[in-house]
Every structure is written in C-alpha cells, then in structure tokens.
Amino acid sequence: MLRANVVVSLVIFAALMQCMNGKENITPWIYSMKQPVSCNREHSEIGICLSGIDDDIQNDGKCWKFCLMVAKSGGYNADK
C-alpha cells in the first residue's frame, strides 16, 4: 500500500511539472521575486494587477492609470 501511495504521489508531481511547462509561476496572481517592485500589485480600490495586462500602457491598463494618477515616486512604491 505504501508503494502505491509513493507511485501515485510521483505521478501527480510529474503531471504538475508538465502543466507548468517551464514557467516560473502557473498562477498569474503569484508574482516572481525577480520582478521589479511596482505600483500597487494588489490595491483595495482596483483589485489585483496582473503584470503585462493591467499595467500595459498600450491597452490603457487599470493599474497603469491608477499609478499615474495616485501613486507617489512616479508610479513605483519603494515601500513594498
């Protein structure tokens, strides 16, 4: 029985690794530590800011607008 549990655990682990397909994070709300500290990743007024989507100047992203209008330090908060 223990051997079967180990095999099942390894199969699940391998399946998860395949789903990740080399990506750092498989969930968009978890941010990489390598990213620069940016303006309001999560803010009570605008919600979660998805990197590359909500901060995209070309698509007029909600977080980009908020950072320009409200945030200090030119849109970046060094405190976070």
Swiss-Prot record:
GO terms for cellular component: extracellular region. Its main location: secreted. The keyword Transport does not apply. It is found in: Secreted. Keywords: Antimicrobial, Fungicide, Plant defense, Secreted, Signal. The keyword Nucleus does not apply. Transmembrane segments: none annotated. It comes from the Eukaryota. One of its GO terms (biological process) is killing of cells of another organism. Residues 1-22 form the signal peptide. Belongs to the DEFL family. This is Putative defensin-like protein 28. It comes from Arabidopsis thaliana (Mouse-ear cress).
